[in-house]
């Protein structure tokens, strides 16, 4: 939409085409998403590549679907945009295009996503399998590939529900669903042949030294004993942890609910072979990152984490070593996030958020270990 306004079209006309009843509605949604007004954003020197309405229509013409369906950006229920390269088309379809951004999905990961979705579908899981183009291809292959799928019924759980009175119950549902997903992924892993990530060497060889620098630079207050404890104790546990094909990105936006139950998972672009604990812990930190404005965040997040662990363990029992390693895997995720976001200029604010999260997690070490040991 922004590129069309920049091209000289009237803002109200563009807003109406993109499904807003008024320009005011478009303006509010834009500010909520980008943090500034459309006018200010037009003058930014770095604007991500955007598709015009006409360009998206030309892409969709390659599929045998009604060509007058509305095209809208995808938002999770509390208003945050999921991605700049994914759109809903009518009520049934999802269009995804290859992204330019280094930290977004690339061609290989999109094709891997197709493979996993097809294999999960064959296992009886709800999955976004591709709709063939008019020529019978699974995707449109051009300068950028485009994939059209039928959306899985459901929406990400609202923040109000994640942190609400039923947070422990919803935590259990997250954990149970990840456990069922892991059972299916373990079956299909030989067909997918995923790349393997050694979490321990990845953190100790890169992320941990970077966080050490930031600990000094930003006066985070993490003691030297935190880093040494991680190296020593997680080093002993790591080789004993079960590893398999995992989702890798089960943040709340990628887990859909319908009627209060998990209806499916989306976006397997980052899937890899890693410790299976990663998905449980990543789900919990993905929820924690929305902590601002939540009263009693300490107790509420620990309730959610306890629910996730309990739900997973009831379906796919955790080993003793996994229970001991929960805290270290959560810290691994946070150190990776802190190191990565600080290295990308436009994401430094996210680095700050993740530093605060890491500080909070370290403060909660005893409680986190108690939760996992009580399973």
Where in the sequence are the language-model features?
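Short hydrophobic/aromatic patch on the recognition helix
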Residues: 25-26, 30
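An alpha-helical support segment within catalytic cores of ATP-dependent transferases
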Residues: 56-63, 187-190, 205-248, 317
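ATP-binding pocket architecture of kinase catalytic cores
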Residues: 91-188
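Active-site activation/catalytic loop segments of kinase-like enzymes and analogous catalytic loops
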Residues: 277-316, 331-349
């Amino acid at each position: 939409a922004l590129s069309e306004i920049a091209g000289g079209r009237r803002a109200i006309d563009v807003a109406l085409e993109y499904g807003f009843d008024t320009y005011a509605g478009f303006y509010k949604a834009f500010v909520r998403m980008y943090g500034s007004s459309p006018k200010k954003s037009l003058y930014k020197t770095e604007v991500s590549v955007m598709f015009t309405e006409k360009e998206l229509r030309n892409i969709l013409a390659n599929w045998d679907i009604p060509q007058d369906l509305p095209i809208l950006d995808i938002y999770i229920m509390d208003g945050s945009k999921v991605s700049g390269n994914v759109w809903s088309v009518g009520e049934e379809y999802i269009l995804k295009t290859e992204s330019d951004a280094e930290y977004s999905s690339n061609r290989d990961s999109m094709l891997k996503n197709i493979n996993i979705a097809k294999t999960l579908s064959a296992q009886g899981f709800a999955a976004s399998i591709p709709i063939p183009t008019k020529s019978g291809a699974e995707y449109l292959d051009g300068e950028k590939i485009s994939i059209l799928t039928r959306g899985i019924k459901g929406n990400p759980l609202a923040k109000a529900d994640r942190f609400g009175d039923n947070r422990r119950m919803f935590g259990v549902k997250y954990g149970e669903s990840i456990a069922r997903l892991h059972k299916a992924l373990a079956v299909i892993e030989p067909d997918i042949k995923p790349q393997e990530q050694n979490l321990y060497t990845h953190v100790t060889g890169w992320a941990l030294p970077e966080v050490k620098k930031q600990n000094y630079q930003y006066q985070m207050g993490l003691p030297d004993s935190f880093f040494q404890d991680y190296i020593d104790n997680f080093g002993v546990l790591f080789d004993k942890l079960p590893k398999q094909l995992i989702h890798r990105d089960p943040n709340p936006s990628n887990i859909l609910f319908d009627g209060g139950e998990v209806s499916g998972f989306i976006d397997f672009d980052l899937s890899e072979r890693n410790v299976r604990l990663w998905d449980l812990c990543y789900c919990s930190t993905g929820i924690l990152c929305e902590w601002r404005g939540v009263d009693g965040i300490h107790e509420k997040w620990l309730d959610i984490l306890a629910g996730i662990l309990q739900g997973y363990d009831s379906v796919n029992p955790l080993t003793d070593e996994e229970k001991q390693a929960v805290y270290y895997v959560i810290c691994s995720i946070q150190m990776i996030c802190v190191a990565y976001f600080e290295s990308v200029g436009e994401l430094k604010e996210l680095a700050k958020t993740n530093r605060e999260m890491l500080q909070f997690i370290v403060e909660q070490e005893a409680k986190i270990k108690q939760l996992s040991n009580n399973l």
